[in-house]
Amino acid sequence: MIHDPNDAGLPDQLPTPSSEAENSPAGDTTPPEEALHRRRIRSFVTRAGRVSTGQRRAMDELGPRFVVPFAPQQPDWNSVFGREAPRVLEIGFGMGATTAEIASHRPDEDFLGVEVHEPGVGALLKLMGEQNLSNIRIIQHDAVEVLEQMIAPDSLDGVHIFFPDPWHKARHHKRRLIQPKFVALLVSRLKPGAYLHCATDWQNYAEQMLEVLGAEPSLKNTADGYAPRPEYRPVTKFERRGLRLGHGVWDLVFRKRGAG
């Protein structure tokens, strides 16, 4: 989910995942495999949000066509999109403005957006209706489970992860999305030669991203460190505000080894 970089206190208001031993009830008989699945890092933290009338209308009218229900099986994505085309996954599209803009400028590619928060889903559907975009599909579910169960290995042409929650406090860094195990899962779904593009406005997170992505043997950095912002990624309103305040933004673009 795209965060507001100026809302630095927000993570402290969020519920803490019950992954610590003291949060487990006495005598818990949960099987070890199930308990491990329950405790692992998820790609999101639940936030409340109000769905506007326009967003709700878009969900009612366009959701049946463009929202793909989560299912523990791999759909025929060519049938879902109605064609065979390069496919890009975006994890955490926030309110969808960036997703819609990129999709509008790349009509020959298909975009699969994963977002758990309902207002964001409604907002993107509303933009799709206003701009007559048909090359986007949405899954409202945890990205980890989507990758594991709905995306085939070596099938994606690109992945976008723009401004994920930075979990700015050191004790919360373990909750960050870009971790070695998640990156390994992500890379397994990329085609050889496909790209992974991450962006963040937190320098500490950018440094962690660079370290984690650089340590993944299947990835190669396209730049000497951080990459210039690719032209296809628009500057967000939060980014503009941050830049006016002197804040930095870091883009990282890696490719999966093995092409050609």
UniProtKB/Swiss-Prot annotation:
Residue numbers binding S-adenosyl-L-methionine: E90, E115, D142, D165
Residues annotated as catalytic: D165
Enzyme Commission number(s) from the entry: 2.1.1.33
Gene3D superfamilies named among the record's database cross-references: Vaccinia Virus protein VP39 (3.40.50.150)
Binding residues for substrate: K169, D201, T236, K237, F238, E239
UniProtKB keywords: Methyltransferase, S-adenosyl-L-methionine, Transferase, tRNA processing
Keyword Transferase among record annotations: yes
Region (Disordered): 1-37
Enzyme class: transferase
Pfam families: Methyltransf_4
GO molecular function, one term: tRNA (guanine(46)-N7)-methyltransferase activity
GO cellular component, one term: tRNA methyltransferase complex
Disulfide bonds: none
CDD domains assigned to the protein according to its UniProt record, in alphabetical order: AdoMet_MTases
PROSITE patterns recorded: SAM_MT_TRMB (PS51625)
InterPro entries in UniProt: SAM-dependent_MTases_sf, tRNA_(Gua-N-7)_MeTrfase_Trmb, tRNA_methyltr_TrmB_bact
Pathway where this protein functions: tRNA modification; N(7)-methylguanine-tRNA biosynthesis
Catalytic activity: guanosine(46) in tRNA + S-adenosyl-L-methionine = N(7)-methylguanosine(46) in tRNA + S-adenosyl-L-homocysteine
Function: Catalyzes the formation of N(7)-methylguanine at position 46 (m7G46) in tRNA.
Family the entry assigns: Belongs to the class I-like SAM-binding methyltransferase superfamily. TrmB family.
Stated name of the protein: tRNA (guanine-N(7)-)-methyltransferase
